[in-house]
Amino acid sequence: ALLVDIVLSPALAFFDPVSADALSSVVQAPIVEEVAKGLGVLLLFVFGRRAFDGPVDGVVYGALVGAGFAFTENILYFATSLIDGGVGEVTFTFVLRGILSPFAHVMFTAVTGFALGRAVRRGATPGEALWPWIAGLIGAIALHALWNGSAVFADFFALYVTLQMPL
């Protein structure tokens, strides 16, 4: 994930600040974050193979990795918004991240876990599970990019009502 970030960050310098921010949110963040979380799920699969029995386990493990990531990221966002903008800013950040989208990272990483769980159910070895893991990772990255992009390019609340709430 760090390598992806190192490659993508300099490329953003070629864009104007507004476009660079949008690309960072819609392209860079989903790739970097989902690869990092996906590696966590893959490590659970490789080293906890006896407890990784199928798609439901994959969803649960992926969701837990995503929840841990979201918890950590939210603490960082809350602290930064409090320092930079005070009570009003941290309140806005809390509503946006803590109430409107607490399960976004959970949902994205669960997709990666589901793909690995299906591979387990089919009897895949860790080596054979690499392609299903990549497929799940692509799904997670796409959902994350769609989610972040909705705040930049589309109607965030329409996506929230049609995708986030039902899931």
Language model regions located:
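Hydrophobic alpha-helical segments at protein termini of multi-pass membrane proteins
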Residues: A1-L167
